[in-house]
Curated annotation (Swiss-Prot):
It is a multi-pass membrane protein. The gene is Vmn1r42. The keyword Disulfide bond applies. Pfam families: V1R (PF03402). InterPro entries: GPCR_Rhodpsn_7TM, Vmron_rcpt_1. This is Vomeronasal type-1 receptor 42. Belongs to the G-protein coupled receptor 1 family. The chain crosses the membrane at residues 33-53, 66-86, 110-130, 151-171, 210-230, 255-275, 286-306. Putative pheromone receptor implicated in the regulation of social and reproductive behavior. PANTHER family: VOMERONASAL TYPE-1 RECEPTOR. Keywords: Cell membrane, Disulfide bond, G-protein coupled receptor, Glycoprotein, Membrane, Pheromone response, Receptor, Transducer, Transmembrane, Transmembrane helix. Residues 54-65, 131-150, 231-254, 307-329 are cytoplasmic. GO terms for biological process: response to pheromone; sensory perception of chemical stimulus.
Amino acid sequence: MGDILFSSPQSMFSHTMNKNSILHTHSIIGKTFFSEIGIGISGNSFLLLVHILKFIRGHRPRLTDLPIGLLSLIHLLMLLVAAFIATDIFISRRGWDDIICKFLVYLYRVLRGFSLCTTSMLSILQAIILSPRSSCLAKFKHISPHHISGAILFLSVLYMLIGSQLLVSIIATPNLTMNDFIYVTQSCSILPLSYLMQSIYSTLLAIREFFLISLMVLSNWYMVALLSMHRKQTQHLHGTNLSPKKSPEQSATQTILMLISFFLLMTIYDTIVSCSRTMFLNDPTSYSIELFIMHIYATVSPFVFMSTEKHIVNFLRSLGKRVINFNLH
């Protein structure tokens, strides 16, 4: 108290400037985050609508149509929940109670788990599509959507069970006076776990992430090997001077490969940051930046998937030409 009473005007001015700078930075991050969420919601809504129309019109579904359509729905719901949670981070405290905190945060984590499991399944299915007829994976090319849905549901249930400790550890904290709490929003925090419980949870979390990431890494490696082998065979048949024309499946595979590789980096980053926040950090600004980075995949993915759909690209081009012609007239 004495330090505050007898502090110099310069130090008080410096403290005020630092506080204003932090608030300004927080405001910029918030505006950027909500812009990201808006773009992601628009993209996923459009992609979901496209897949619904394809289903209604009776188009023959491809092996990857179900997981891509499901991903758009998952990401749409996840971004909506994230936007609602973010209002308690960037705008104002809503005074949520324990039930609301547990419901929102756990629902958000469940949707993120669905995203991880569905992306893992998508990488496996894309590897199956690319596999040659002589491959042992070729027999799975005619797998039914029911089996795909069952596999995604099984992985998601395992993911939910391991993360169910959040239902106990998430609480409403109207007044953050203890440093032991881990910041989630202005109204919600995570209770610190004992060393034993933290060790058990971290081990289960590591096993879960390692299993799903391993599936994606193996399928990605398999697809890269197949693409490389096909390129060498084509160059051998047609000569090195001619650039071989890519099939639609190969172009789609390369695009999905880049997207899944990016998702892998984001997942590894999220795991590292989550563990470090649990053990060392509790900074709302760092947490806000982490939130922005974590949602890049959900925001970018629908546009990447749409770029592989020739009929969507043609539709958007024709729509753009109509808008330009309308403005000219």
